[in-house]
Design a protein with these regions (language model features):
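Short, glycine-/small- and polar/acidic-enriched structural segments
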Residues: 27-177, 181-187, 200-204, 209-210
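Secondary-structure end/capping motifs
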Residues: 225-311
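Bacterial N-terminal signal peptides
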Residues: 10-22
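Pocket-lining segment of extracytoplasmic ligand-binding domains
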Residues: 90, 169-264
């Protein structure tokens, strides 16, 4: 008797039930998710929305742009204007330290999108001593990335000159005009800088540096009172990551639409494809557990301002139970088996 032949239909049936969406009769329930910026890093959320992956599990989701960084999205979360936010995570940690019941639910990736791009004469990080390094603003994700890289190199912040330029395009102009010797750039701007001949001298992805990027945050009260609804939302969220990683053409088209990049702008479309490749192959994680290691990085930074923060447990700032349930049930594994 062919035992493999017997078990194949059983395996197929199990896969069907694991991925079975919410019944159509279930009323669609509105949830709003706020994004801190318009960025390619939001690709998986846009894909989940555009491909109807939240509706598939009986949840009506509206994706809104809050802007103004993580602090503003956390404020909108606390006010009840949104039920979930996607941002850098530090805002949620700061609010929790003040006693506000925000919580980190997932981290789609935890290694930085920033790279230090330097003028051609700067060969290695050691050549950065005494040089002007541009960031957007103090307290930004790029500023944190720079501080972490300097620490990894056993360099102090006062051994370089940190200057602010407000935006990635402005920093690139600063490099061109010699107003900065290096700049902490993000996607897709560092691809443009590389094309112009600037050199990569620091990349957190290759330096084993973890910090919060693209964290999904919510309120503990919502998680307690609406666990089933949140779990269904999370199914759409993690399936969005899987769809993004597995469907390059459609994902790029959705990002192109959201970023308002016209098809005739070949250079911009090329940079968008490079951004997709980096996100899909290197950054996005299949099982987006909240990263305790990345949370600890933020706590260590904040402990420089308040030593008492060293006593806090990084695990207490996150609720991994939703991702764990989807992981343990085989739901996430099944998404990649299709």
């Amino acid at each position: 008797m062919n035992r493999v032949g017997i078990f194949r239909p059983i395996g197929a049936a199990l896969l069907f039930f694991i991925l079975l969406p919410a019944l159509p009769s279930r009323a669609q329930e509105k949830l709003r998710i706020g994004l801190s910026s318009v960025s390619a890093t939001n690709g998986s959320v846009w894909v989940a929305d555009e491909k109807g992956l939240f509706r598939k599990y009986g949840v009506d989701v509206e994706v809104v742009i809050i802007g103004g960084g993580g602090a503003r999205t956390v404020s909108a979360l606390v006010a009840g204007d949104i039920q979930f936010s996607v941002g850098g995570g530090e805002g949620s940690i700061r609010s929790q330290l003040r006693g506000v019941e925000t919580v980190i639910v997932a981290s789609s990736f935890t290694k930085g999108l920033q790279r230090i791009m330097a003028r051609p004469e700067i060969k290695t990080y050691q050549d950065l001593r005494g040089k002007k390094i541009a960031i957007t603003q103090f307290g930004s994700a790029g500023h944190l990335a720079l501080l972490l890289m300097l620490k990894k190199w056993n360099m102090r912040p006062d051994q370089v000159q940190i200057v602010t330029f407000g935006s990635s395009p402005a920093m690139l102009v600063g490099l061109d005009k010699g107003a900065a010797d290096a700049a902490v750039l993000t996607i897709p701007t560092f691809f443009l800088a590389e094309d112009k001949g600037y050199r990569i001298v620091g990349d957190p992805v290759t330096m084993d540096i973890f910090y919060l990027q693209n964290t999904l945050e919510s309120m503990r009260s919502l998680l307690r009172s609406n666990r089933d609804r949140v779990l269904r939302f999370m199914k759409g969220y993690v399936e969005g990551i899987a769809y993004f990683k597995k469907n390059k053409r459609e994902s790029i088209e959705i990002m192109q639409k959201k970023l308002r990049i016209q098809s005739q702008q070949e250079r911009d479309v090329r940079y968008l494809e490079l951004s997709y490749n980096l996100l899909a192959s290197t950054l996005y994680t299949e099982v987006p557990y909240p990263s305790v290691r990345a949370i600890q990085t933020i706590l260590d930074k904040l402990a420089e301002e308040d030593p008492k923060i060293k006593e806090r447990d990084a695990k207490s700032f996150a609720d991994e139970s939703f991702i764990k349930e989807l992981d343990d049930s085989g739901f996430i594994k099944a998404l990649y088996a299709q």
